[in-house]
Regions:
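Autoinhibitory N-terminal propeptides
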Residues: 1-150
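Substrate-binding/access-modulating region of protease and related hydrolase catalytic domains
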Residues: 66-69, 96, 191-196, 208-293, ...
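Subtilisin-like serine protease catalytic core
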Residues: 68, 133-217, 226-229, 240-243, ...
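Sec-exported extracytoplasmic/periplasmic mature domains
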Residues: 75, 79, 102-106, 189-193, ...
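Catalytic-core environment of secreted peptidases
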Residues: 153-165, 300-352
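C-terminal subdomain of the subtilisin-like protease fold in secreted/lumenal serine endopeptidases
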Residues: 198, 209, 363-434
Length: 435
C-alpha cells in the first residue's frame, strides 16, 4: 500500500466513488497534530532548538505554497522567517503558537531543527578486498577509482599532504578544526606516497572537500559541476532521529541524481539508549539522514571482523535494517597533517572505507560499460548483496548485510550478474537465471 497527500476542492459522494474506482481504500483528514514530528507531538524537544524564548523549527507546505504570501499570517503569530532549507523554510516561533501554525491548510509538516553535527571517528584494503581490485600490472584489474570524484564533508580545511597532491579538485571549507577530515580523506583516496601502509582505498580518485554538511547541501550543483558520484559524511545528526526532513532530502537526491550514492558512518553510540524502545544497545544510529532508504550507513568492525562495542546498532526508527554494511573502523592507519599518519578508531573511519571501495566499483563499472556511469541503486545493491555475512545469518542490526567485499562486487560487474526490469500491478514477469 502507498500513502499520498492530496488536496480536494470539493469532497462529496461523487468524488469518493471516483477515488474508490482508482483503487483508493481509505482516506483521512490531515489534522493539525498529524503534521508534527514525534518529538513536537510528545512535547519532548531537545535543548538545541531554543533560541531565546522561541523554538527553531523546519516547516514544509503544499507544492503550490508561496511563502511570501504567508507573511501576514507569520506576522500575526510573531513568527520569524529565517530562510529556505530543503523543501521548506526555517522559522522561529513561540512554543504555544505551534498548533496555530499547524492549523494552516497550506502547512503539511513541522519538525524541530536538525541536530547539530558532531564528528564520529593496511588491514582495511585487505579485508575489504580493495587491494585485489587495483593491481596495475598485466592481468590485474586496475580499479583504483581513477576519474571518480568523492564529495567529502568534514571539520574544516584539510592540510597539505603529499598523499593528496594534485587530486583535491576544490577545497570549499573554512579554517581547520582538527585532524578528523585529514584522516578520513586519506582513508578514501590517500596515495601512500610517504608510507605505503597509509594508502587509501581508491588512490586514483579525486576529492571535493567541504565543511559538513555542505557536501550534501551543494550536491544539486556539484553533481554536475565536479561530477561527484559518491559522498562521505562521518558526522552525527541526532540519535535515532527518525525520518527527518534531512533524511527526505538525501533520499530525493538519489532520484534527482541517479548515479549518486551517499555514504555515512552509522555512529559511535553502540551502548546508548536513544528511546527506540528496546533498551540500551539498540536503535541508536546517530542520525536522521543515515536512516534514509537510498543511502549507506556503515558499521565499524575490527580487523578480525568483530563488531566494535561503540558501533551504533539498528534498527532504523521505523524498523528497517540499519546499518547497511560494515567496514574496518578500528585502528585505521591514515593521513595526518603535515605529511604524517596515525591510527584512529570509529565509524568515522569505516565510512570512508566504503566510500573508497565504491569509487573503485564505479571505476570498474565504467571500464566494463564504455565509460557509462552506473545507477546509485545498482551500486548499493552490488555492495550489500556481495558482502561477507557476519553475525546472525542474513542481514542484522549490527553488521547490516556484512563486511564489504569489493572483489566479489567487482566480479558481479564484470560478469554482468544484475538485471534491471520493471513490472506493473497484476503483471507477471519471468526472468531466467543460469546457475
Amino acid at each position: 500500500f502507498n500513502s499520498y497527500l492530496i488536496t480536494l476542492s470539493n469532497l462529496n459522494s461523487k468524488t469518493i466513488i471516483a477515488l474508490k474506482k482508482e483503487g483508493v481504500t481509505g482516506m483521512s483528514v490531515l489534522m493539525p497534530e498529524m503534521k508534527l514530528s514525534k518529538q513536537l507531538a510528545n512535547n519532548n524537544v531537545p535543548d538545541y532548538i531554543w533560541v531565546g524564548n522561541k523554538w527553531e523549527l523546519y516547516i514544509e507546505g503544499l507544492p503550490s505554497i508561496d511563502w511570501n504570501r504567508l507573511q501576514n499570517f507569520f506576522k500575526n503569530l510573531e513568527i520569524d522567517l529565517l530562510g529556505p532549507q530543503f523543501e521548506g523554510v526555517r522559522i522561529l516561533i513561540s512554543p504555544e503558537k505551534v498548533m496555530d501554525l499547524a492549523k494552516h491548510p497550506m502547512i503539511t509538516y513541522i519538525q524541530q531543527k536538525e541536530a547539530p553535527a558532531i564528528p564520529e571517528n593496511k588491514i582495511g584494503i585487505k579485508n575489504h578486498r580493495s587491494n585485489a581490485l587495483r593491481v596495475p600490472y598485466a592481468g590485474g584489474r586496475n580499479y583504483d577509482g581513477d576519474g571518480i570524484v568523492v564529495g567529502h564533508g568534514d571539520d574544516g580545511d584539510i592540510q597539505p599532504h603529499i598523499d593528496f597532491s594534485g587530486r583535491v579538485l576544490a577545497n570549499k571549507s573554512g579554517p581547520s578544526n582538527g585532524a578528523h577530515g585529514d584522516h578520513v580523506a586519506g582513508t578514501i583516496m590517500g596515495a601512500g606516497n610517504l608510507d605505503p601502509d597509509g594508502e587509501g582505498q581508491a588512490p586514483g580518485s579525486k576529492l571535493v572537500y567541504y565543511d559538513y554538511p555542505d557536501n550534501l547541501n551543494d550536491i544539486d550543483t556539484d553533481y554536475g559541476l565536479y561530477g561527484i558520484r559518491v559522498t562521505a559524511s562521518s558526522y552525527s545528526n541526532g540519535c535515532n532521529a527518525g525520518y527527518t526532513s534531512f533524511t527526505r532530502r538525501v533520499d530525493l537526491d538519489a532520484i534527482q541524481h541517479p548515479s549518486l550514492t551517499h555514504v555515512f558512518s552509522a555512529g559511535n553510540n553502540g551502548n546508548s539508549n536513544c528511546n527506540y524502545g528496546a533498551g540500551s544497545g539498540w536503535g541508536n544510529i546517530t542520525g536522521g539522514h543515515k536512516q534514509g532508504k537510498n543511502v549507506i550507513a556503515t558499521a565499524n568492525v575490527t580487523g578480525s571482523d568483530i563488531i566494535a562495542g561503540s558501533s551504533s546498532r539498528g534498527p532504523a526508527h521505523d524498523g528497517r535494517i540499519k546499518p547497511d554494511i560494515a567496514a574496518l573502523g578500528t585502528n585505521v592507519f591514515s593521513c595526518l597533517a603535515p605529511n604524517d599518519y596515525r591510527s584512529i578508531t570509529g565509524t568515522s573511519m569505516a565510512c570512508p572505507g566504503i566510500a573508497g571501495v565504491l569509487a573503485q566499483l564505479y571505476d570498474a563499472y565504467r571500464q566494463n560499460n564504455n565509460g557509462v556511469d552506473p545507477e546509485g541503486g545498482l551500486m548499493r545493491a552490488l555492495l550489500t548483496n556481495n558482502a561477507d555475512d557476519l553475525g546472525n545469518p542474513g542481514p542484522d542490526f549490527k553488521y547490516g548485510y556484512g563486511r564489504v567485499n569489493g572483489l566479489r562486487a567487482a566480479k558481479a560487474i564484470e560478469m554482468n550478474w544484475f538485471i534491471k526490469d520493471t513490472i506493473a500491478q497484476n503483471e507477471t514477469d519471468t526472468i531466467d537465471i543460469p546457475v
